[in-house]
């Protein structure tokens, strides 16, 4: 059976993947992966899809915002098959939605706990500063500079970790899973949320940092005449 993969944006932009390929530049990393996809398409009839327009648009914007040249854009358009997932016909078991709602509730509660801890920490710090400085204006300035800023930064990181880790938090994430389910394809991503729910849906998952090596291994076993074995 012909191999099919559905790519998340992270399939082309993942830092760990570039490190494994020993490439520092993001655009060159994207080029290297797209070259492997092109060779696999020509020699092995492996097809790599991206949901349209969600992930396709993300890839275009990511490439342009990071200064990638027009050749990278052309490679995206040429070697990645654009397809809109059939959101009406793809059937997902109801227990998946039930579990997802429960999981989201748990994450929201964890996020609330992080927020409460940040508020308590800020209050304690403010009171300790206020007890040492009588000038209200100085208290406000010192609080903003020494307390609120660092705590808000720490709070944001903790909140993202508590609330977003392991969830599907964007339309492109959902589109990737729906399209993979529709095509009976494997998902390629470095997003734990996509991985977790791919497993729930019975969709094969390929980590982004192993995908290029997988393609290289396929190509290494391609007969020298360029044909593929069936």
From Swiss-Prot:
Report keywords, A-Z.
Answer: Endonuclease, Hydrolase, Nuclease, tRNA processing
Q: Which Pfam families match?
A: PIN_5
**E.C. number(s) listed in UniProt:** 3.1.26.5
Question: What GO molecular function terms would the record report?
Answer: ribonuclease P activity
Catalysis: reaction(s): Endonucleolytic cleavage of RNA, removing 5'-extranucleotides from tRNA precursor
List the CDD domains hit by this protein, alphabetically.
Answer: PIN_VapC-like
Job description of the protein: RNA-free RNase P that catalyzes the removal of the 5'-leader sequence from pre-tRNA to produce the mature 5'-terminus.
Tell me the protein's name: RNA-free ribonuclease P
